[in-house]
């Protein structure tokens, strides 16, 4: 049986309108947060990470992950305090509620213009040896994938994610215990395409 990958991609690839909306919302949030950092004298850089940044998000699953990267010498308490302060400022600006979560340190999840948004403080590391918390590596992961995944391979990642979702093996959450999106991207970078993976 021959698979019609184009038909599958039409079902799982975000439309140009969806991509444009996600890009616009992401830009608005990032600009607000970076301006808030600058106007308050907070030394931090706002960065888009995750599948939206890597162009590997499935249709309807375009969660926006925005990291606020603080210098390595920043004290952890300051990072937590200012990270949450900036996230709450953003929620007030967009008139939305903030949900608190905890990974290596607190972060905020909210919904802005129909998009789920995570605002996460982290440390700006240049390599894995500087890792201070688990979330710090996310920026490095995003950078690696963007540098190594070709445009045509982005579709291959979508096919792999969909296949894994259909078999119940996609999702790194505890209840699923499956493959993370980052692992799907690494597999496509290594093997080249969905069929070889």
Task: For each feature predicted by the language model, list its residue ranges.
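Short amphipathic alpha-helical segments, especially helix-boundary/capping motifs
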Residues: 5-10, 62-65, 136-137, 160-164
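N-terminal regions immediately upstream of nucleotidyltransferase
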Residues: 1-61, 72-78, 108, 122-124
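Catalytic cores of NTP-dependent nucleotidyl/adenyl transfer enzymes across multiple folds
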Residues: 103-197
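Well-ordered mid-protein domain cores that form the structural environment of catalytic cofactors
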Residues: 48-49, 56-138
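Generic non-transmembrane alpha-helical segments
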Residues: 28-41, 85-94, 163
């Amino acid at each position: 049986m021959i698979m019609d990958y184009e038909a599958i991609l039409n079902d799982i690839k975000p439309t140009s309108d969806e991509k444009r909306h996600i890009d616009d919302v992401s830009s608005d949030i990032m600009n607000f947060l970076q301006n808030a950092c600058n106007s308050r004298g907070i030394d931090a850089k706002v960065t888009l990470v995750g599948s939206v940044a890597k162009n590997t998000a499935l249709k309807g699953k375009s969660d926006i992950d925005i990291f606020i990267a603080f210098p390595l010498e920043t004290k952890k308490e300051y990072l937590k305090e200012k990270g949450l302060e900036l996230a709450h400022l953003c929620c007030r600006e967009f008139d939305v509620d903030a949900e608190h979560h905890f990974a290596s340190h607190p972060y905020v999840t909210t919904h802005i213009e129909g998009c789920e948004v995570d605002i996460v403080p982290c440390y700006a590391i240049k390599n894995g040896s500087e890792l201070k918390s688990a979330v710090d590596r996310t920026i490095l992961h995003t950078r690696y994938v963007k540098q190594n995944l070709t445009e045509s391979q982005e579709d291959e990642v979508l096919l792999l994610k969909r296949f894994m979702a259909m078999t119940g093996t996609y999702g790194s959450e505890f209840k699923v215990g499956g493959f993370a999106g980052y692992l799907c991207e690494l597999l496509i970078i290594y093997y080249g395409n969905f069929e070889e993976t």
